[in-house]
Amino acid sequence: EESPNLKNIFLDCGCTSKEELEALGIHVGSVVTYEDEFMILNHRYYVGRALDNRAGGFMIAEVARLLKENKQKLPFGLYIVNSVQEEIGLRGAEMIADWIKPNVAIVTDVTHDTQTPMINKITQGDLACGKGPVVSYAPAVQINLNRQLIDVAQKNDIPFQRQASSRFTGTDTDAFAYSNGGVPSALISLPLRYMHTTVEMVHKEDVDNVIRLIYETLLTIEDGQDFRSFTK
């Protein structure tokens, strides 16, 4: 399929003449974009620009709020951080990992909903908004920490989906996992439609369930817990 270019796209302004168009102030070189407003669609979806990854920032802030409101005393120090420049090289996560030197990292980001036209489920998986957080399998994801996430989801009746990545997750998980001699890391993803557009879409229940999964998982981690499969 031919990608969009100046030969196959057009702007429909509802005009019938060049003069009518110019009267609207539209001319060659005018900047065109989608209407930039956050909205709730059909009572189910949040729609807006840059939900990737402002949604992640919201979800981890909600985890912090729940911990405080429920007066939870964790047996370890917890850093809740939001990174920058993930899209151009995981730079923020690399700096955070070097500065904090974490023992464990739970990362949240978005992943593609694959239910829309022109997406190949064979290559990208069968993932859907509204069916729960996505738990990833990848070289950067520590298997025992991942199993703990899944166990928490099952015990708390939190719906979840599975996704596999052969090389990279494409998220900050890759930065944390290979920092400081290796950090047990896991990725919880939020299904999202129309990534990198001004109309990104996520399901309200998925947002709530990502928050629940991170929160409940934190309550199960022990101080000094060893996630290694093999020890000396």
Language-model segments: residues:
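N-terminal hydrophobic/helix-forming segments and targeting peptides
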Residues: 1-232
